[in-house]
């Protein structure tokens, strides 16, 4: 996402899926499929259903995203 600016939105994890994928419900009630960013995977940050997260969405595909932050 280096060429275009990513869209950052807040959301809540609904359901964990295989391969570090998650269904996330955004603040505007859209549901997106999101994967964990590399740094979160590297440092073993656990994400559970109900966690508040920040998701980066590409302007080209608003149905998929990357989880970049888990709120405490």
Swiss-Prot record:
Q: Which domain of life is it from?
A: Bacteria
PROSITE patterns of this UniProt entry? S1_IF1_TYPE
For this protein, the record's Pfam families field holds: eIF-1a
SUPFAM superfamilies annotated for this entry? Answer: Nucleic acid-binding proteins
Q: Where are the membrane-spanning stretches? A: none
The keyword Protein biosynthesis is annotated on this UniProt entry: yes
What are the GO MF terms of this UniProt record?
Answer: ribosome binding; rRNA binding; translation initiation factor activity
GO CC terms on record? cytosol
- Localization of this protein: Cytoplasm
Print the keywords alphabetically: Cytoplasm, Initiation factor, Protein biosynthesis, RNA-binding, rRNA-binding
Start and end residues of each S1-like domain: 1-72
What does the UniProt record say this protein does? One of the essential components for the initiation of protein synthesis. Stabilizes the binding of IF-2 and IF-3 on the 30S subunit to which N-formylmethionyl-tRNA(fMet) subsequently binds. Helps modulate mRNA selection, yielding the 30S pre-initiation complex (PIC). Upon addition of the 50S ribosomal subunit IF-1, IF-2 and IF-3 are released leaving the mature 70S translation initiation complex.
Q: Could you tell me which HAMAP family the record lists for this protein?
A: IF_1 (MF_00075)
**NCBIfam families per UniProt:** infA (TIGR00008)
Q: Assembly state and interactors?
A: Component of the 30S ribosomal translation pre-initiation complex which assembles on the 30S ribosome in the order IF-2 and IF-3, IF-1 and N-formylmethionyl-tRNA(fMet); mRNA recruitment can occur at any time during PIC assembly.
The record's comment on protein family reads:
Belongs to the IF-1 family.
Question: What protein does this entry describe?
Answer: Translation initiation factor IF-1
Per the UniProt record, the lineage of the source organism begins with: Bacteria, Pseudomonadati, Thermodesulfobacteriota, Desulfuromonadia, Geobacterales
Name of the gene this protein is made from: infA
């Amino acid at each position: 996402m280096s060429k275009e600016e990513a869209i950052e939105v807040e959301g809540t994890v609904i359901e964990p899926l295989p391969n570090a994928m998650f269904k996330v419900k955004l603040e505007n009630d859209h549901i997106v499929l999101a994967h964990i960013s590399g740094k979160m995977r590297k440092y073993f940050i656990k994400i559970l259903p109900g966690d508040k997260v920040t998701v980066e969405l590409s302007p080209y595909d608003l149905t998929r995203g990357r989880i970049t932050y888990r709120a405490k």
